[in-house]
Amino acid sequence: MKKKIVSVAVIAIAFVAVVLLCVKFKNNTTETGFFAMNTVCSLKINGKENDAVSKVIQAMVENLDTAILSRKNENSEVSRLNGNSGGNIDKKLHGWFSVLLDVCKKSEGKFDFTLGAVSDLWDFGGEARLPDSVLIEEALSHAGAEKIVLENNSVYYGDSFTVDFGAAGKGIALDEIKNYLDATQTKDAVVSIGGSILLYGEKDFTVGIRNPEGNAGSHIAVLKVDGCCVSTSGGYERFFEKDGKTYHHILDPDTGYPSESGVVSVTVVSQSGILSDALSTACFVLGIEKGSALAEEYGCETVFVDENKCLHVSEGLKDKIEISDNSYSFAEQ
């Protein structure tokens, strides 16, 4: 069985997360890149009519971003909901809300997609600043996914709530793309949207886990996986330093400040894009013990990297991972 090699790296350049891919396919392959969902996206498609397939995928991602999920676009569905404290929603949006609310509940609120107002105070995607604690407390008073009421064809939440699909939107896009590829004659594909990747096909893939302290092209370990979705969340993606302290973009919903769970990065492997994306954030904030238990509850595999350069690997990946940087080691079990 031939193997396709994927080297994954997430870096922050001008506050844009970039994933670098190196994939070897046979002939009849199309490669393209574009910008959407506030990040760089890349496609590598192998199959019949791959040029047309690539164009459709790009249009799908751009439409999903601007017309549905973007809270910055005043004409999107999410912006409409935020401006009206909820409203009627279609079946797909209902399904996404349902999944994320379940993750919120099972993570004991450590995953929360109503922190848009808090995130805006930090502005990690722009100037990046340390907000006043009073402003953070005020913003937190207008958050809390547990306050969302999801009904058959509608959703409602409190005044001044800002629902933000940023921690799950890329995974949602991967699920939509996978469903589309299933209906085409595509043999193999690698789709990268920020820190989330769809590995599509029946052959093995080798995925490099980025070195949190190294350059964009370096990795600390390699995973051998079948077709799946892989999402990584790391404090190195977007951050700034002030008075000798580093502030990263992954916020703890309980405090409104960057998580201090002792985790440097989390990689989640799942057949579901939305789960891989949302759980990578949830597990980062929960920490290793509770995060591992949460991922296991959803049938997902994980690799945690802690502050001591130790890798904590779930049972299903232990025979599929090798360390490639000798300064890192596996945690003692």
Describe each PLM feature range.
Residues 2-333:
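Mature catalytic core of soluble alpha/beta enzymes
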